[in-house]
């Protein structure tokens, strides 16, 4: 039986001024898929994943989530982003908050959870990525690899159906890359649906069930 279709990207185009970055990209993501997007620098990989999360609004084309056009159905994109989470290359943690608070804030403000419930969920996912002993640390006290693991836990705490990752290891020192890739590998084994922009070719081959190669804005 074919797996449930979660995301469908159809003829996606994105221009910045006169420059067309994405020139008609189409692909589907089904439950349990791990799709890696690879390609040379400047090919449009990060623009594509930012469009899927609506951090950039596509110039043309559609993105359907569970058969419904995101642009039409989710007037509040915040709710869509709880279903389709995002991990950034630059972590995007709140520097004035502890590790635990970073993983709680979205649950309370967006999902309307109680602080107690949010804390329980946050601790669960921090433990999952091996960061539960750092709950009271601030981001500036962490290494790059630790920050990225916290960022992954924060995204997981919203319990998304699809997790998008934009070059999750590109801002890390080489010795930190392995610890983050290990976490992502574990998530893949557990069946989490993911779309990952990466330049780690061996990792893409190892972890994904589909690789999309983008060059000059096309697949």
Where are these regions (language model features)?
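ABC family nucleotide-binding domain
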Residues: 4-7, 13-219
């Amino acid at each position: 039986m074919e797996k449930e279709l979660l995301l469908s990207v159809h003829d996606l185009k994105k221009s910045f001024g006169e420059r067309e970055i994405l020139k008609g990209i189409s692909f589907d993501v089904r439950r349990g898929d791990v799709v890696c997007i690879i390609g040379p620098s400047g090919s449009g990989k990060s623009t594509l994943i930012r469009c899927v999360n609506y951090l950039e609004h596509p110039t043309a084309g559609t993105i359907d989530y569970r058969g419904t056009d995101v642009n039409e159905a989710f007037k509040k994109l915040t709710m869509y982003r709880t279903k389709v989470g995002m991990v950034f290359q630059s972590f995007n943690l709140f520097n004035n908050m502890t590790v635990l608070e970073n993983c709680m804030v979205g649950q309370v403000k967006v999902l309307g959870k109680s602080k107690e419930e949010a804390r329980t969920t946050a601790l669960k996912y921090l433990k999952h990525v091996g960061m539960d002993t750092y709950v009271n640390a601030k981001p500036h006290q962490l290494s790059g690899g630790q920050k990225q693991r916290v960022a992954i836990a924060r995204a997981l705490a919203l319990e998304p159906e699809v997790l998008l990752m934009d070059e999750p290891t590109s801002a890390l020192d080489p010795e930190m890359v392995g610890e983050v890739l290990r976490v992502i590998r574990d998530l893949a084994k557990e069946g989490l649906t993911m779309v990952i922009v990466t330049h780690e070719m061996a990792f893409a081959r190892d972890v994904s069930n589909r690789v999309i190669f983008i060059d000059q804005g096309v697949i």
